[in-house]
Amino acid sequence: MTMVEHYPFKIHSDFEPQGDQPQAIKEIVEGIKAGKRHQTLLGATGTGKTFTMSNVIKEVGKPTLIIAHNKTLAGQLYSEFKEFFPENRVEYFVSYYDYYQPEAYVPSTDTFIEKDASINDEIDQLRHSATSALFERDDVIIIASVSCIYGLGNPEEYKDLVVSVRVGMEMDRSELLRKLVDVQYTRNDIDFQRGTFRVRGDVVEIFPASKEELCIRVEFFGDEIDRIREVNYLTGEVLKEREHFAIFPASHFVTREEKLKVAIERIEKELEERLKELRDENKLLEAQRLEQRTNYDLEMMREMGFCSGIENYSVHLTLRPLGSTPYTLLDYFGDDWLVMIDESHVTLPQVRGMYNGDRARKQVLVDHGFRLPSALDNRPLKFEEFEEKTKQLVYVSATPGPYEIEHTDKMVEQIIRPTGLLDPKIEVRPTENQIDDLLSEIQTRVERNERVLVTTLTKKMSEDLTTYMKEAGIKVNYLHSEIKTLERIEIIRDLRMGTYDVIVGINLLREGIDIPEVSLVVILDADKEGFLRSNRSLIQTIGRAARNDKGEVIMYADKMTDSMKYAIDETQRRREIQMKHNEKHGITPKTINKKIHDLISATVENDENNDKAQTVIPKKMTKKERQKTIDNIEKEMKQAAKDLDFEKATELRDMLFELKAEG
C-alpha cells in the first residue's frame, strides 16, 4: 500500500500573466473553489491559453487530467506543460498501439480480421508512469488523448497489488520473487527490459514497468532487505540510495489468483449459456468457433494468468455485473480532481462518438461467434458515464461548441494577446479574376519573406490550384488527408523554414498550423454556406493569421453570408479590444518568435488511420443497397462536420455526389 505525498505545483517561466490572463485565471480559480461544475475559457488564438491553464492548476493545486483530441496535439501539450512544471509529475497517457487494427468480421465476405497491434514500448512505459504517479503524489498533470475513456483494470486492485520494499523489512528473496510474478513481472537474467527482473545471488534487480532507464537493485542479508538502490540499467551506475520503493504491477489488467479462479468460473458459465443459445438458433459454425476460441483463452489464463485479448474478459476479471460501467483512467484519480478539455469543440464530440463506433464493430464479432457477449463490456465510456465520473471541468476553445455554451452560464474570455498582436484585417473581394489576384498577393508576401495559407472547398480545386501555382514558379505544397502525421509535421516545418512559401488545403484547422511566419490566409469560395464555411470554422481559419503583425485575411466571395458577417464582426470586436489594450499600455504588436518543440518520438503515430472515411463503396449495388449506402455516408459526413474534421466530410461529400450521379 502506498501513501500519496503532497507537493505544491511550481511554474517555471520568465513571464508573469498579463493582458486579460490574470482576470481569466482569477475567474476560473474562483469558479473551481466555489464548486462550479462547468466553465469555459474562450481563448482567442495566440492569447497564451496553455499558460493560463498552467496558472489555474498551480492556484487550485488539484491533480489534473487534460484531454486533447489526438496524440499529436497531446504530445505538443505534454512538451509545453513539462517546460512549465519541471518539478512536478507531468505525465502522458495515449493509446499504446503504434499500429492498431481492431479485430473485426465482415459477414458479406466471411472475412475475420485478427487484432493486429504492435505495442509501442515508450508509450506503454509512459502509461504506467501516469497511473503509478496518481498513487504516489498529488501534484500530477496527465495529458491524455480520448483513449483515456477506454477500459482499464480495477484501480483498487492495481494499488493493492503494489510490491512495497523497505530497508530493514523482513522478507526473504523467494517471497519477493513470488510477489513480482504475481504482478505480471517475468524473470529474465539475459534480456533485461521493462517488466522483468533478474537474480544474482542475494541481489534482485527489478525493471519497473513505469521507468525508462531506471532499475531497482534490492540487496538481501539473510531474510532481511539490507539495501535498496536506483541504478541505470544500461551503465550499472548507482543513481541514489532509497529507503523505500513501490513496484507497481506490470499490467493494468492484473488480477489476484483467487479472483482469477472466480473470473474463469464466470466465463465458463457464460460460455455454456451462449453455446446453448447459438445451437438453439442452429448457428452451429458460430458455436464451434466460440467454444474453440474461448477454451483456448481459458487454458492460457489458467497456465499463465494472462491471454491475448484479455481485455475482452475485463467485466469478469474485475467481477463487475454485466453491462456496468468499465473502469478507466478517470477512476485512478481520487475524489478531488480537475478535468480540462483542450479544443473542446472537437474533443467533446469525439468523446460522445466513441461508444457507438466501438459497439457496432464488437456486436458483429459477438453475433458470429468470435467473442462472448460480455466482450461488449470492454468498451469506452458512454457520454453520460463520462459526465457522471467528472466533477469539475474547464473547456478550452477559441470557438466553444453547443455543449459548452449550454452548460456554462458565463464564458471566461481571453481576447488580449500579451504580444499585442491584433486579429487580422479582413478584406472581401469578388471572385472574378481571383486566381490572378491571389498570385500577385502571394508574390508580395514572398518578397517580404512571409508565408501564405490558401483554403479551398474541394480536393480537385486544391490539386488544380497547386499545379497552376507550381507552373507559375511558386514554391507550394498541398496538404491533404492522405498525408501521414509525420509528413504533415515535416511540411509545416518546411513552410516555416522557407522550403515552401504557400500551403494549399481543404482543412487547415488541424493541429500544428499556428505558424508565426504566415501573414496571409486566403479563403476561396467564402460565400458557399456549409460546414467548411460555417462561422466557427471561418473564425478558426482567420485565427491562423493572428500570429503575425502583418496578418491579413482575404475572402473571395460574391455575396455576404450570415457566417461571413458573424466571423468578420467577431474578429473586428476582438481587434478593437486588443487595440485599446495596446494603446493603454504602449504596446507595439510584434510577430511571435516561436521555437519548434520536440514532440515525444512516439506521438508521431498512425493518427491518420482515423482520418480517412470509413465507408467503402462496393462496385455493384442494387437500388436499395445504394440508398442505404447514401444514408450511411450522409450520417458519417454530418458527424465529421460536427467534429470539425472537414477533410473527411469533404471526401464523404464527394462520394455522395458520385453515388447520386450514378443512381
UniProtKB/Swiss-Prot annotation:
UniProt-annotated binding residues for ATP: G43, A44, T45, G46, T47, G48, K49, T50
Keywords: ATP-binding, Cytoplasm, DNA damage, DNA excision, DNA repair, Excision nuclease, Nucleotide-binding, SOS response
UniProt entry tagged with the keyword DNA damage: yes
Residue ranges occupied by any Helicase C-terminal domain in the UniProt entry: 434-600
One example GO MF annotation: ATP binding
Entry GO terms, CC: cytoplasm; excinuclease repair complex
Domain Helicase ATP-binding: residue ranges: 30-417
Stretch forming the signal peptide: none
GO annotation, biological process: nucleotide-excision repair; SOS response
Residue interval(s) of motif Beta-hairpin: 96-119
Main location: cytoplasm
Residue ranges occupied by any UVR domain in the UniProt entry: 627-662
ATP-binding is among the record's keywords: yes
SUPFAM superfamilies for this protein: C-terminal UvrC-binding domain of UvrB (SSF46600), P-loop containing nucleoside triphosphate hydrolases (SSF52540)
InterPro entries the UniProt entry points to: Helicase/UvrB_N, Helicase_ATP-bd, Helicase_C-like, P-loop_NTPase, UVR_dom, UVR_dom_sf, UvrB, UvrB_inter
One Pfam short name: UvrB
Subcellular location: Cytoplasm
Description of its domains: The beta-hairpin motif is involved in DNA binding.
Function: The UvrABC repair system catalyzes the recognition and processing of DNA lesions. A damage recognition complex composed of 2 UvrA and 2 UvrB subunits scans DNA for abnormalities. Upon binding of the UvrA(2)B(2) complex to a putative damaged site, the DNA wraps around one UvrB monomer. DNA wrap is dependent on ATP binding by UvrB and probably causes local melting of the DNA helix, facilitating insertion of UvrB beta-hairpin between the DNA strands. Then UvrB probes one DNA strand for the presence of a lesion.
Similarity remark: Belongs to the UvrB family.
Subunit structure, as described in the record: Forms a heterotetramer with UvrA during the search for lesions. Interacts with UvrC in an incision complex.
Name this protein carries in UniProt: UvrABC system protein B
Organism: Staphylococcus aureus (strain COL)
Gene (name only): uvrB
